[in-house]
Amino acid sequence: MRARRGGPPVPYKRPVQSPDADTVMLASVKTDPGVTPEPAASPPDADHPAEEPSAADQPAATRPAAEPSAAEPSAAEHWASSTRVLTLPRGKRSGPARWSAPSARRTWVSRAALAMILGVQAVLSLRLNNTASGSEALYLYAGHLEAAHLLHGAPLPGNYASYFPGVPVLYPVLGAAADSIGGLAAARAVSLLAMLVTTGLLYAMTRRLFNERTGLCAAALFGVTEGAILAGRLATSDAVSLALLALACWIVVRTASWRWRAYLLAIPVACLAAATDYWALLYLPTVAFLAGLAAHPYLSRPALVRALVLAAVMVELFAAGVLIAGRDYVTAAAAATASRTPGSGQALPILAESGKWGGLIVALAVLGAVSYALQARTEPNEHIALPGSRRRRIALGVVLAGTALLTLAAQLRLNTDISLATHAAFGLFFAAPMAGVGLARLVGDHFRRAQIGIVVWTAALILGLSQTSQFFGSWPDSSALVGELSRYLAPGARYLVENDNVAIYYLKGQPDARPGQFTSTYFIAYRTPGGQVLTGTAGFAAALRAGYFRVIIYDSTVTPALDKSLAATLESDPRYRLAGAVPENARDFRATCYVWVRD
């Protein structure tokens, strides 16, 4: 270091640098205006401290005097401390996290990962194979009847609007149109496409709420849940309704930062989702809350008005729909979402089933909600959507993770586990973003604990594989039974079949197998020759004595008490004979179907 004029050498000062800083502040000096500055010497090395140059090596102009002159100005007058700021390249710790930093390459990697997730989900659904279930058969043949009624004015055999879990002219007609083109496989393909769209929208929504990594984690977890796999393989309204609900959520998140009211586009989509399947009504408040919470980091408190506007407009639309369509739809919606099944002792089985269907995802969602509330980022300087205040983060976690528990509460209120498998998919869709946060926190920054994420996802995959296979094997292959029944069809004949929906669906188009010719063992309203209407066991017994049915089929599984009474009556009546016994075998179902025919 060069010596100052009239004073001792200036000691070397090391740069002030923080490990996480983007700049380095270097000590500097101001030269005497009368002295021409010399080129700066190379800075000393950290391992080799600066050495003072000897006086002989210095130019005469800068060689220190033996005694400072009193006439000379002091060092403080000619030399003042100052700093220079040098911007350094971003380091590993000071710059953005490499995984979360936007780049074209990572965009394509994320798209490829999403395609793989959707491919796995499709394979998991397509591997399930069985004949139509009772619910699928009901939706599809009712859709054919509704389409014929709309297009040709054909009479309907019943008032489907009074008990269907959705508006009968929506999904049933769509499913029937696909069935007309490619049969049951095409109708199921509609559901699969809807569920793949749902997973894709979940990724897009979560990516905007958090970031790319969290979106992929959420999609990977949701795609292997039992509800998503089953809904994608059943020709029912659940998948289409959930896809519409996902679209509504994506709209409110995508338009969160927009000043103009584009979020209102979510209202008709959400209402259509609820009309397709009344179960979606339970999740409309979540859509409204999500609209406000997603916009809060951008618009602050005025964003909460969005939630109120969405809720108010949706209520008005449904009120107008009820006034136009009639109270039958209200009755059906109440039955689907709020009517309690008689009986007790169902709480523990429902809790156990719910734990199997979604316990892992809900646990991850709770973990994600807590960790997100405590700390917005997984790693320092992680690229993430505006997290907002801690209150906002807590509210978002409670709304998303808590919606999964709403499904459980609704099933406990209904006192039944019927349709729990597909209903769980609705709640898990909303919990999946927070579950993605939880999985990302378990994995850690820079995939530090990737093995934990692999173990968790593998556990979810194994649960999805085992439970969906078990569910899809809970009803038997009906091919043999339908073939046996088709041998005894006759013009104007009546058929008593335990599950008549399946027979009606597979025999559609047969002139002697119209829906009005079938009766199930669930209910009968038989009018005697004297004009008296009998229901229940008395009605079935009176119909058998009168020879009302040509074919009677039962398997003692759904209505065992009634089937036992039917068997006793048929065995004592010489007009009926046992035409066959068809075994019904499935993975978790064993029964024998008895076919009685009146000669």
Regions found by a protein language model. Give the residues of each.
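Short acidic/glycine- and proline-prone juxtamembrane loop motifs at membrane-interface regions
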Residues: 133, 191, 227-240
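Start-transfer (signal-anchor) and selected internal transmembrane alpha helices
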Residues: 1-41, 45-50, 55-56, 60-124, ...
